Amino acid sequence: MKKFLFIALTLISCIQAGAREGLRSPSLCAFRPMYFIGGVPLEGPVNKSTAGFKFQFSVALPLWKSMAGREGLDLCFGYTQTSLWDFFDDSSPFRENVYAPGIYLSVPLERDNLLLGLEHKSNGRPMRGTSDDNYSRSVNYFFFEYGAFFHSGLVLKTNLHAGVGWYDEEFTQEVFWRFHGYADFTVGYHSDKWQMAATATPVFGPFGMNIDAGVARKIGSYSLFIQFNHGYGEALSDWVRGYHPASFLRLGILIGNLL
């Protein structure tokens, strides 16, 4: 486990160094936010089974840069992995790993950006034949994300997505309207030292809204990062009818950008 974390952190450092030096295709680059944070639930007991760590690793590999001679019009393959680690529990198991590979097209629009893509997201558990059947979850969807970046540092993003998901041993739309949602709405701010973002995802499940919010303060090469999460946005195995996941508050480090 320690070896795995060492390799992951080393690779992240290499990606960050490459970004600073302006490496070109086909080098890996950071894609979505990368962080390592730890914390506790804000509801229910705090103990070795509920406290733990969360980390996210996300990279993109350019496949075709400056398509049609237009700078910034790039096609890439991306991969994001989010892990929930019950470090303090017996044997320190990973409670959930969410894997999200995809193909993405980035379209520059002056200060703004348009991102189109096809993404698969799953927790990697088999669909049939084992005791994990009841917790196998996956979604496949197209998405359209528009980000508006203002001179003041304000950032507004809308992400619309539609597809099909695997739930209760069948492909269904239920995972979208009940747990995953069809749209994400983000309000953020960035400056030389600060980054802030809050994302709301309307759903029709018990929570009514998945919320993910974070604040980062740059300190040297990294940023001190605090994150609040509420709803079904973290663990796909929490997608259970009638189940109410706990809200979490976590603190740690952010590598790169939050927005």
Tell where the protein language model's regions lie, with residue ranges.
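Cleavable N-terminal export/targeting peptides
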Residues: M1-L23, L258-L259
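Outer-membrane pore/translocation modules
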Residues: A19-G38, S66-K193, A198-P206, Q227-A246
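Long, contiguous juxta-domain segments that are non-catalytic but functionally important
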Residues: M34-I37, E43, K54
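N-terminal intrinsically disordered, low-complexity regulatory domains
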Residues: P41-V46, D86
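N-terminal low-complexity, intrinsically disordered segments
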Residues: N47-M67
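Short, well-ordered amphipathic alpha-helices
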Residues: F57-L63, P101-S106, A213
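Short, electropositive alpha-helical surface patch
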Residues: N210-K218
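Outer-membrane beta-barrel "beta-signal"
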Residues: H244-L259
